[in-house]
């Protein structure tokens, strides 16, 4: 039996997103992935995911399964030089990229790595439905501002 979740549709200045809720960044860099996103994107524990930076307006990152990057999106050449160390940043075209494993429905990113994405312990990240391959965690921008006017669950 599938669980039912309640996403909120948020619209601001012509931009709209479905929000799962807020993910609070733990002191150790842990970020819980909302259960609905885990189900919708078939995210499994121990899978490798890539943190791909978002644009400057909203900040944050997309959480994409590494297998999708290499197969579906054809990023083999760009990812070839990624560090073998989990959570270590490599810049690609001036933007930070890193990989981590999903554990217990969330990710733990080293605090110094999160700083590369302008994210810090205690921050609330707005978790929204991204494109067809990845949930997105936003830091700022009009959608985040509008989301503050709604009652959304906080995952921590």
Regions found by a protein language model. Give the residues of each.
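Short linear sequence motif anchored by a di-proline
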Residues: 17, 28, 32, 40-48, ...
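Short beta-strand-centered segments at strand-helix junctions
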Residues: 27-42, 101-118
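Acidic-enriched, low-complexity/disordered segments with a strong bias for Aspartate over Glutamate
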Residues: 28, 45, 76-77, 104, ...
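DNA polymerase processivity clamps
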Residues: 45-53, 121-129
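Short flexible/disordered coil segments
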Residues: 83-89, 116-124
């Amino acid at each position: 039996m599938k669980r039912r979740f309640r996403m909120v549709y948020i619209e601001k200045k012509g931009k709209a997103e479905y929000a799962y809720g807020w993910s609070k960044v733990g002191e150790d860099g842990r970020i819980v992935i909302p259960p609905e996103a885990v189900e919708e994107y078939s995210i499994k524990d121990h899978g490798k995911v890539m943190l791909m930076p978002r644009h400057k307006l909203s900040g944050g990152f997309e959480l994409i399964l590494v297998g999708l990057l290499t197969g579906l999106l054809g990023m083999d050449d760009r990812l070839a030089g990624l560090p073998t160390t989990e959570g270590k940043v490599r810049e690609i075209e001036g933007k930070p990229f890193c990989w981590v494993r999903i554990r217990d429905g969330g990710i733990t990113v080293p605090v110094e790595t999160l700083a590369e994405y302008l994210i810090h312990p205690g921050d609330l990240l707005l978790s929204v439905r991204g494109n067809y391959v990845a949930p997105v965690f936003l830091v700022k921008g009009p959608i985040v501002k509008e989301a503050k006017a709604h009652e959304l669950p906080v995952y921590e």
